[in-house]
């Protein structure tokens, strides 16, 4: 009797979760380094347009809802966990779609990196500060960067898919 190896049609989940784990590790290690090196609000200019600075974000992207009474910590944590469940489902179903899955893996790693901050500290640790003259882009972290790159790749993948079906 011949043995057949069944390969799931959905593709493997492990490689994508591995990418998410790498994002989480780099994100958390960078935040630990900043916490050990900087006092809150301290900044170190690396170039004429880029500083490292330690700030806490109790809200969402760009400080949205950061001045709310505290409920946002749990709301954004729940949102991150919900996004994790949806992304894991999508990765199981579409793991063979490389660009789509890579984008989701980056978003997942970034979302979980920020969820970990909210659970451990009650806020997200941000430290990358780009500026021009007196204008500063809101500080962010590696998790935010992974989410942004993942979102851009997701949009690119969808545009490519739509154009391919015309």
UniProtKB/Swiss-Prot annotation:
Q: Which GO terms describe its molecular function?
A: aspartic-type endopeptidase activity
Q: Does the keyword Cell inner membrane apply?
A: yes
Instruction: Give the catalytic activity.
Output: Release of signal peptides from bacterial membrane prolipoproteins. Hydrolyzes -Xaa-Yaa-Zaa-|-(S,diacylglyceryl)Cys-, in which Xaa is hydrophobic (preferably Leu), and Yaa (Ala or Ser) and Zaa (Gly or Ala) have small, neutral side chains
Q: What is its main location?
A: membrane
Transmembrane stretches in the record are 9-29, 45-65, 71-91, 99-119, 135-155
Q: In which pathway does it act?
A: Protein modification; lipoprotein biosynthesis (signal peptide cleavage)
**In which compartments does the protein localize?**
Cell inner membrane
> Topology relative to the membrane, per the entry?
Multi-pass membrane protein
Gene Ontology biological process = proteolysis
Which leading EC class covers this enzyme? hydrolase
Which domain of life does the protein's organism represent? Bacteria
- Write out the entry's keywords from A to Z: Aspartyl protease, Cell inner membrane, Cell membrane, Hydrolase, Membrane, Protease, Transmembrane, Transmembrane helix
| EC code | 3.4.23.36
One CC-aspect GO term: plasma membrane
Q: Where is the active site?
A: 126, 144
Matching entries from Pfam families are given as: Peptidase_A8 (PF01252)
HAMAP family in the record: LspA (MF_00161)
Query: What is this protein for, i.e. what is its function?
Result: This protein specifically catalyzes the removal of signal peptides from prolipoproteins.
* Family of this protein: Belongs to the peptidase A8 family.
In terms of PANTHER family, this protein maps to: LIPOPROTEIN SIGNAL PEPTIDASE
Q: Report the protein name in the record.
A: Lipoprotein signal peptidase
From which source organism is this entry? Answer: Burkholderia vietnamiensis (strain G4 / LMG 22486) (Burkholderia cepacia (strain R1808))
Tell me the gene name: lspA
